[in-house]
Amino acid sequence: MLKELRNIGIIAHIDAGKTTTTERILYYTGLTHKMGETHDGDSIMDFLPWEKERGITVASAATRCFWKGNTINIIDTPGHVDFTAEVERSLRILDGAVVIFCGKGGVEPQSETVWRQADKYQIPRIAYVNKMDAVGADFFRVIEQIKQRLGSNPLVISLPVFKEECFSGIIDLIKMKYYTFAGKLGNDIAEESIPSEYTETAEEWRSVLVEKLAETDETLLDLYYNNEEIDAGLLSRVIRTNTVSGNMVPVCCGSSYRNIGVQLLLDSIVDYLPSPLDLPGSKAVIMETTETINIMPDSQDAFSALVFKIINDRHVGRLAFARIYSGKLKAGTVVFNSSKNKRERVGRLLRIHAEHREEINEVAAGDIVAIIGLKDIGTGDTLCSENFPLLLETIDFPQPVIQIAIEPKNQAGLDKISEALNRISAEDPTFKISYNKETGQVLLAGMGELHLEIVAERLAREFKLDFNTGQPQVAYRETIGKSAEQVTRYVKQTGGKGQFAHVVLRLEPGEGFEFINRISQGSIPREYIPAVESGIKQALEEGVLKGYPVVNVKATLLDGSFHEVDSSEMAFRTAAFLATRECLKKAHPRMLEPVMRLEIVSPEEYTGNIINNITNRRGKLESLEMENHTQIIRGCVPLAELFGYSTVLRSLTQGRAGFSMEFSHYEERHLAS
């Protein structure tokens, strides 16, 4: 039943305890009989070799478990900024999220990033303050940070209890009960009266909870004003309504590593996060009419699904992970890839549990599945019924910001490296490949040094390739500053059939890449239009200034003509390519460089030195914030100025400061700078 289905993601800053929490969830729901640990390298969700060795999540991993009659599809995502695209693609297809915060670290830089991503997709969420056993953990400070830094409306539903300064249990503010988790693995849950020393605090926070909820529900408001007893079931229903609407974020606490509170978190997931039926549906465009409609999760409707992840499995080949939005999908049936205008036959359907697979025959609306057998498939593609072709909203990914050059140790290895890189780039939309024609080097572009380090490791270990790598470089981009038009007639006459294509093209500044066809009355036959778009895209792969990819361009095909005999797809592709190159020269080409958002945590006495250094690196200071005698400095600095910054910061602060950075935006860089 869809009502009992939850599609959720676990998202957080690195080391907040995402994978540890997921491992406990799998154990308590009976899916596993042993708790894996990231520090021991035996966690079920981090099953890739480089994840086990580093103790971090690199790729999002899916699993499915059951709790109190509900089915929970879980996607555990990376916390490292280099792999933020994994969070992006996961949130696009999920209905809810658990955002984990470290009880000591609170709202950290990547916490803010994943929160913004969840806001972008309007994902209802629960906050879980983890690591309450850590020295320096402060539950109420984290609540305040969630409110102030994230602009959220936190609703505290549980309180931590400490005995002799040790985290010992949790007060449930809805039931007004105290819970302890005994036994080595926290299996023995005891429900007790609230300890006397916590009674006053619990009653205060219970009043805050009821007051906030009463503002949104008349029945609750009447009971509250009349001092009548309030049923826990009513509170839960009102909390659910406010969570699903995004009005409030329930906050609970625990220590996953110490096995305290995870069962209560599971209760909150099924009680407060939405089922597919609770949400307004997913937008789609009907291809025939370009009308925008809402797709509801009805298994009786026409089939539609969005592919959100591709992996190459050594046992079964290419696996396409998809969220089913409507209808049903059966193994062996033919589907229509509306993003590529192609028919595809589905081979087998699999349920995924980390690296383990379970074959199924059918999947229905609202669920998540892995598909084997799709040949020409990419992340963000829509699969649908050929009788009702439509396009679901795709997934936006950030541009790569850093690149390295690699060279095979012998020429024979170049083809093997190219094949391996193409397989990796099919899996990872933020990983790009290009070739330097002058040096013969292969350039790999990604979101950060760790991202590219993992790619290089995969090439060596998974594909058994031998190569040299260069130093990291900035992945610059080019764009245009004004509109330009070009008329190009491509005519080539040889002994036999000639080539002819005539295009009138306009380029102007835009967002991303957009192609518009303004051809009317058949001056260019419809079958040649895709070739024109292909030629434009090919020309944008290398800019006219320094050969970097060109971004943020809107291309409009205004007019043209053809020859009945000599015109061909190749002729129009070539004409569009040449026209685009000429347009780029006339449209005030400009260089763009990636700018990073920097956060530095330092003792106060080094603030002046750090700010001066940021300014000297062409940086812009955004904010200063004091917290527990520690200065938090935030600003934006071009990536080109940040190579080796960790060494510089150590020198400036005698090793007492730390920093993190994430991609912010691209901005113009003058060639003289």
Curated annotation (Swiss-Prot):
SMART domains xrefs: EFG_C, EFG_IV
Record-level Gene Ontology MF annotations: GTP binding; GTPase activity; translation elongation factor activity
Main location: cytoplasm
Top-level taxon of origin: Bacteria
HAMAP family, per the entry: EF_G_EF_2_B (MF_00054_B)
Known role: Catalyzes the GTP-dependent ribosomal translocation step during translation elongation. During this step, the ribosome changes from the pre-translocational (PRE) to the post-translocational (POST) state as the newly formed A-site-bound peptidyl-tRNA and P-site-bound deacylated tRNA move to the P and E sites, respectively. Catalyzes the coordinated movement of the two tRNA molecules, the mRNA and conformational changes in the ribosome.
Protein name: Elongation factor G 1
Organism: Syntrophomonas wolfei subsp. wolfei (strain DSM 2245B / Goettingen)
